[in-house]
Design a protein with these regions (language model features):
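Short aromatic-acidic-glycine turn motif
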Residues: 147-156
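Conserved active-site loop/cleft motifs that coordinate metal ions or position small ligands
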Residues: 33-34, 128-131, 151, 176
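Surface-exposed beta-strand/loop patches in extracellular or lumenal glycoproteins
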Residues: 131-147
Length: 178
């Protein structure tokens, strides 16, 4: 988790990492997550250099005591990433629109956003999954019908009767009608 063309100084490395996974969590099917990804572990490039085996890049071996210690410390990357993923996956598993076979529709909002709409099999729940793909505050207009939806990720956020949404760098919102 270093820098990218969208985050040249690496100021939002955790946010970018979580945004990438949140996008994956919004797709159909069951998300596959590498064990190391649960803790935000970077690729093990040193291991790859030693072995030359491409697969070794994501096969970091944890010391059980070390990871447990880092998980207990609320100030570590490992704790933050794991708790955030746990929060997102707990939300996801409760939503009918995130059923593996629920409908997905892509919505083009330009290069600064990733957006899809998920509709439950019974057509009763719609979730708009929206991610800011940049390191800047972005504003996007939203369809009037979505302005009364609630944000599943942060229920304290109110979007009542909005015509547009301001989104922080690499922020994701899941707007649901139920």
């Amino acid at each position: 988790m270093k820098v990218s063309d969208k985050d040249k100084k690496g100021l939002y490395s955790y946010d970018r990492y979580i945004a990438a996974h949140t996008i994956m969590f919004s797709f159909e099917g069951v998300p596959g997550i590498y064990f190391n990804s649960l803790f935000g572990k970077s690729n093990d490039e040193a291991k790859y250099i030693i072995t030359g085996n491409n697969r070794d890049v994501n096969r970091y071996r944890w010391n059980e005591l070390n990871i447990l210690k880092r998980m207990k410390n609320k100030n570590t990357k490992e704790h933050y990433i794991f708790e955030t993923f746990k929060h997102l996956l707990n939300i996801r598993k409760k939503q009918k629109a995130f059923h593996p076979n629920a409908l997905r529709t892509n919505i083009n909002l330009g290069n600064n956003f990733f957006c899809i709409k998920r509709i439950s099999l019974d057509k009763k729940q719609t979730i708009l999954c929206l991610t800011n793909l940049t390191s800047k505050l972005q504003n996007t207009k939203i369809n009037k019908k979505f302005s009364k939806f609630k944000n599943l990720i942060d229920p304290h956020t109110k979007f009542q009767n909005l015509k547009s949404i301001n989104m922080k760098p690499f922020e994701t919102i899941w707007l649901s009608n139920t």
